[in-house]
């Protein structure tokens, strides 16, 4: 079914796929199995991957590496992006949606050619860690998103998020 749907022009990526250990609604082994299969499908179809990873940082990184999400072959499918000095930077077309990992993990992902997105929680007063991570990500590998209607930024926290609030996240 999914393979057939990807033949349509509107499908531009495989995702949001990944691991969510926060609620453990699905057994972790089952999550890891299907995550691998979805990465394999994205590689087979030469499509970008959008990752959801919640409280599963190391498993996510390990599986992405093992399944070739950062391979030289995969990077060859996509145009490189230009860095701040005009140099060409390899792009694996892997996007980590609402990244909440460490600065060290962010640096590893950037070196592998991944893009990291930052959401509303970066604006929360008690979320210094995510602000520090965002400051260290080169702009060429940073995406600002809303995750609307969730993860509403300050000063609208407690209300449903809206796409128009992205400017508060970007500040």
What is the predicted role of each segment?
Residues 120-122, 146-148:
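Short secondary-structure boundary segments
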Residues 113-119:
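Short, basic, glycine/proline-bearing loop/turn elements
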Residues 1-112, 124-127, 132-133, 151, ...:
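Divalent metal-binding pocket/active-site signature
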Residues 50, 95, 117, 143-145:
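Structural detector of well-ordered beta-strand residues that form the stable sheet scaffold
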Residues 137-139:
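Active-site-adjacent capping/gating segments
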């Amino acid at each position: 079914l999914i393979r057939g749907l990807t033949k349509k022009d509107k499908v531009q990526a495989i995702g949001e796929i990944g691991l969510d250990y926060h609620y453990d609604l699905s057994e972790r082994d089952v999550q890891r199995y299907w995550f691998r299969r979805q990465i394999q499908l994205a590689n087979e179809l030469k499509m970008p991957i959008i990752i959801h990873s919640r409280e599963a940082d190391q498993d996510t990184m390990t599986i992405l590496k093992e399944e070739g999400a950062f391979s030289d072959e995969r990077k060859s499918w996509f145009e490189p992006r230009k860095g701040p000095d005009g140099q060409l930077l390899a792009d694996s077309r892997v996007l980590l949606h609402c990244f909440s990992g460490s600065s060290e993990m962010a640096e590893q992902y950037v070196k592998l050619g991944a893009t990291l997105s930052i959401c509303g929680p970066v604006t929360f007063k008690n979320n210094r860690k995510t602000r520090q991570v965002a400051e260290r990500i080169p702009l060429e590998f940073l995406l600002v998103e809303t995750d609307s209607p969730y993860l509403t930024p300050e000063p609208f926290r407690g209300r449903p998020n809206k796409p128009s609030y992205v400017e508060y996240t970007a500040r």
